[in-house]
UniProtKB/Swiss-Prot annotation:
Kelch repeat start and end residues: 353-405, 406-455, 456-503, 504-550, 552-606
Keywords on record: Cytoplasm, Developmental protein, Kelch repeat, Repeat, Ubl conjugation pathway
Chief location category: cytoplasm
Name the record gives this protein: Kelch-like protein 40
Places the protein is found: Cytoplasm; Cytoplasm, Myofibril, Sarcomere, A band; Cytoplasm, Myofibril, Sarcomere, I band
Length: 614
């Protein structure tokens, strides 16, 4: 009777362990040694049977008619003895210490002697260590050692971060074939194909005479059909390396003809059958399949991965993050992370970096200031939130703004006994990942709103001394390190929505000294004047304003609504409104959206291929 699967596996594992322990014991006591590997003066006693069972290289050697198959002592060249010692230790114990310093050497020797288990361990180690500084080196290593699994992982990492990698000089040291392997990928995370052309020409310009010869082949991997005709005419054809090259101009003419509907005659294309390589990856072999018809590669018009970006309303709450596409009336899950604190503030920078600050964080290591606030950044690649250096002093009811490479956390109330109002401004330097202090506000304020425009940071309204709602508006110029007062708002308010829309700052609803309001004002930045705007249909506090693709949206907030007991109670609403420019009125487009409770709302560009449709 056959044993149950689990019991069978346990017995197998036990027998493997027993066998391996026995072999190691015999090695340690010099029993049945029939082989000695000699490397640079060092000797490694071992067993032929063990080497042959783990390595096709040694198996072939011992089974051949070569002189080495009969000798007890075998000299190995081009091998580091320390590395070989680690590999032999692994063969007998399944234990090996792989570090960033030795992984390449161990990888190369494991590849040389065809030891797949160590090969796989090294590949997994390198995949986990992939980063901006080493991804190209690992990509080239994968190609050098004929390891598709590693090369593809590294290439995908490069493609995901192509715009960042393009700033690295190492990209421009790739060979033509290596460059083609990257830029021919559908997974390239770029919004415009023009970026690929510019990278290729920058690469070619490094060694003009040598690399220009490779351009006709490389051009086949640039998807010129995705590039506007004006750009091809004014930038591509007039480039100094393209203009005198008749072969390149001929290829570009094919593209221009295709854009006008004149496709070339189809060519017969012979495809090769795929088989599995040693890593289980699909590799191409020499078997020819039947012929098929195909257009020239330069006419490839398949969109890249990064071209599926869409402008969306990003809703961030402590239960998850949801993206809403008003143009298609579709909702997507972006993240179900529970890291987001309640009562947070969110910010989208002009580079589409998304940040959240707020909540209460207790740092045991800081004795002077143990309380701080969370600071998180959204990772577009993994659709998750990354913990950043926490806000040094815990506070609430503050505002977030940005200028250049800095994020400003302005005013608010201390999250400690007394809840003191603050005029202090904290500055987060994005390149160094450090918090510091900036020039303080001219006054203490909380419940205000902050917007950013043209590298200036605007602070509007809020509550000041004696909890009075302020009309005051200030702007901060980081280059001059100064605050300046601007024309005051018509109505003092706090807990209101604000956004920059078509060159003006719009503020909507909120709390006044007499209660809730539905009034909206617009500030003309050029003239320093406020004007009234179409009122919102309902008095609310904490209404959010979002400007996206030339349209103004109003979302959520709190209104005073009569309940079943006919009592007026503050009620949170999760609806979305859009302003109709032609009819000059607000229109409701979504009555309620999930995960919007307690959320903040910002405009963000998100890749729909990374999102899950609700």
């Amino acid at each position: 009777m056959a044993l149950p699967t689990q019991q069978s596996e346990e017995l197998r594992l036990y027998q493997q362990t027993l066998l391996q322990d026995g072999l190691k014991d015999m090695l340690d006591h010099n029993n049945f040694i029939d082989c000695v590997l000699k490397i640079q003066g060092k000797e490694f006693p071992c067993h032929r049977l063990v080497l042959a069972s783990c390595s096709p290289y040694f198996r072939a050697m011992f089974l051949s008619d070569l002189e080495e198959s009969k000798k007890k002592e075998i000299d190995l060249e081009d091998v580091d003895p320390d590395v070989m010692g680690k590999i032999l230790h692994y063969i007998y114990t399944s234990e090996i210490e792989i570090t960033e310093k030795n992984v390449q050497d161990i990888f190369s020797v494991a590849n040389m002697f065809q030891i797949p288990s160590i090969f796989t361990v090294c590949v997994s180690f390198l995949q986990k260590k992939l980063c901006l500084s080493n991804c190209l080196a690992i990509f080239r290593l994968g190609l050098l050692l004929d390891c598709p699994r590693l090369a593809v992982s590294a290439r995908d990492f490069v493609c995901d971060r192509f715009n960042l990698i393009a700033r690295d000089s190492e990209l421009y040291e790739l060979s033509p074939d290596e460059l083609i392997a990257v830029i021919s990928s559908d997974s390239l995370n770029i919004e415009k194909e023009e970026d690929v052309f510019e990278v290729v020409m920058k690469w070619a310009s490094k060694e003009k005479e040598k690399r220009t010869k490779a351009l006709p082949v490389i051009f086949e991997s640039i998807r010129f059909c995705l590039i506007p005709q004006d750009y091809i005419k004014n930038k591509v054809e007039k480039h100094e390396l393209v203009k005198p090259n008749k072969e390149l101009l001929k290829k570009l003419q094919i593209v221009k003809d295709a854009q006008q509907g004149k496709l070339p005659s189809l060519k017969k294309k012979t495809s090769a059958k795929a088989s599995e390589g040693k890593d289980g990856e699909q590799v191409v072999n020499g078997e020819l399949d039947e012929e098929e018809e195909a257009l020239p590669g330069i006419l490839n018009d398949t969109l890249r991965f990064g071209m599926f970006l869409k402008d969306m309303i990003f809703m961030i709450s402590d239960t998850g993050a949801v993206a809403y596409d008003p143009s298609a009336n579709e909702c997507f899950f972006a993240s179900l992370s529970a890291q987001i604190p309640k009562n947070h503030v969110s910010l989208a920078t002009k580079e589409n970096q998304l940040f959240v600050a707020g909540g209460l964080y207790y740092n045991e290591e800081s004795k002077e200031e143990p309380l701080s606030s969370y600071f998180l950044q959204f990772d577009h690649l993994d659709s998750d939130w990354l913990g950043m250096p926490p806000v040094p002093s815990a506070r609430c009811l503050f505002g977030l703004g940005e200028s250049e490479n800095s994020i400003y956390l302005i005013g608010g109330k201390e999250l400690k006994e007394g809840e003191q109002m603050l005029d202090s401004v904290l500055c987060y330097d994005r390149p160094s990942f450090k918090w510091g202090e900036s020039d303080p506000l001219p006054y203490k304020v909380y419940g205000h709103t902050v917007v950013s425009h043209d590298n200036l940071v605007y602070v509007l309204g809020g509550k000041g001394n004696e909890k009075k709602c302020l009309k005051r508006v200030c702007v901060y110029n980081p280059k001059k390190f100064e605050w300046k007062d601007l024309a005051p708002m018509k109505t003092g308010r706090s807990l209101f929505g604000a956004t920059v829309h078509k060159g003006k700052i719009f503020i909507a609803a909120g709390v006044t000294d007499t209660g809730l309001t539905n009034t909206i004002e617009a500030y003309d930045i050029k003239t320093n004047k406020w004007e009234d705007f179409t009122e919102f249909p309902q008095e609310r506090s904490s209404l959010s304003l979002v400007s996206m693709n030339g349209t103004l949206y109003a979302i959520g907030g709190f209104a005073t609504i009569e309940n079943e007991s006919e009592e007026l109670v503050p009620t949170e609403l999760n609806d979305i409104w859009r302003f109709n420019e032609e009819e000059k009125k607000w229109e409701g487009i979504l009555r309620e959206i999930r995960y919007a409770s307690g959320a903040t709302f910002i405009a963000a560009r998100l890749n729909i291929l990374r999102l899950t449709k609700m």
